[in-house]
């Protein structure tokens, strides 16, 4: 379905963002990308849809070599890839429905897109998608009036309106609270399963990735250092991806060690309260 071989990206500054990255994704596969900041996760996703031009290597979507495309052929190939962004990338002044229909812009003529006149079949499909993501009651609401979770659901519906073969998902939960993050990830995985869609999900939350994504690819300094099941993310593997850390400590224990106030018995004598004053 998607095959990446020896992918490289080097910027004009000389920085090498990706180093010989190779991986294959089959139809219906959902793959999580994890790694520290600057590991190349977003760059990899953007190389696939050619928002970033690779320096070397091959990216094949089916029988199409994406790295060689330009102009009309590249636009046609991008129809096959739906993009879901961290910051939603909605047009704030447009309604929810208009934002979803923008996913069909690659399929209609210039004047139809200019006047936002879409075929009835596209409109009906947009209604169905909004119902599926739980936004039937928000169809005519402006995008800037929505909550973060609702905005991301619009972004998901817009990507699906393209009728893609592959979803490229860049930090879909970074701006969301924990509960909404779980709801969004659950929705994404359910929709991929229903439609047989492949997906690459760049995600910073390892626990969330382990909960929802069956296969994990770990990047460090632009290189693949792990490619396997989520259950294989042992402390040793996480250290290989992120560097040294006590992975046995829970977040609660970390919080206790950082935030817990000192006990009176541990204070220096100069800071201890006189017992007589304590009774006042």
From Swiss-Prot:
Q: Where is the ABC transporter domain?
A: 2-246
What is the annotated signal peptide range for this record? none
Which topology term describes how it sits in the membrane?
Peripheral membrane protein
Q: What is its main location?
A: membrane
Q: Which GO terms describe its cellular component?
A: plasma membrane
Disordered, as annotated region: 247-266
Keyword ATP-binding, does the record have it? yes
Task: Give the catalytic activity.
Answer: phosphonate(out) + ATP + H2O = phosphonate(in) + ADP + phosphate + H(+)
What Gene Ontology molecular function terms does this protein carry? Answer: ABC-type phosphonate transporter activity; ATP binding; ATP hydrolysis activity
Q: What are the alphabetically sorted keywords of the record?
A: ATP-binding, Cell inner membrane, Cell membrane, Membrane, Nucleotide-binding, Phosphonate transport, Translocase, Transport
Annotated compartments: Cell inner membrane
| Enzyme nomenclature, EC number | 7.3.2.2
Q: How is the quaternary structure described?
A: The complex is composed of two ATP-binding proteins (PhnC), two transmembrane proteins (PhnE) and a solute-binding protein (PhnD).
NCBIfam families given in the database record: ABC_phnC (TIGR02315)
The UniProt entry's sequence similarity note says: Belongs to the ABC transporter superfamily. Phosphonates importer (TC 3.A.1.9.1) family.
Chain's role: Part of the ABC transporter complex PhnCDE involved in phosphonates import. Responsible for energy coupling to the transport system.
Q: What is this protein called?
A: Phosphonates import ATP-binding protein PhnC 1
Q: Which gene encodes it?
A: phnC1
